[in-house]
Amino acid sequence: GDSATVFDTEFGKIGLCICFDIRFPEIFRRMVLEGADIVLVPAAFNMTTGPAHWELTFRARALDNQIFVFGTSPARDLSASYQAFGHSIAVSPWGRVLNQMDEHEGMQITTIDLDEITSVREQLPLLKTRMENL
């Protein structure tokens, strides 16, 4: 598409992108500028990119934009032709991993406090001090 996907919910403003989009900081910044507090990323990294980049990219996007980022992944199916890395993840605006699963099927519930976004942005005012003129 040619625009960011951000929508209002009873939980806050949520941004949505998919798998490969996590690699582009610009998409996340656009969603944050449109008010996203949370970004959801359904993704299926493989066994090459997953171990190397999964946690790193999710933590970077959360920290860069001081938002909550959630990545969901299929469980690894050893009988399938495509081997997903798994490791669904929840990351805080400080870049801290709140929850991370392994490669198996399962479910975790992560409780978040959207006030943490304000607190983090007061401690480290990245959005207020960004260099828009570059």
Where are each of the predicted segments found?
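Conserved catalytic scaffold of divalent metal-dependent phosphoesterases
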Residues: A4-V6, C17, I22, M31
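Short alpha-helical segments used as structural interaction elements across diverse proteins
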Residues: F20, L56-F58, T118, L127
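A conserved C-terminal secondary-structure "cap"
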Residues: I117-L134
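Beta-strand-turn-beta hairpins that frame and shape the catalytic cleft
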Residues: S3-G15, I38
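A short, polar/charged loop-to-alpha-helix boundary motif
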Residues: G106-E122
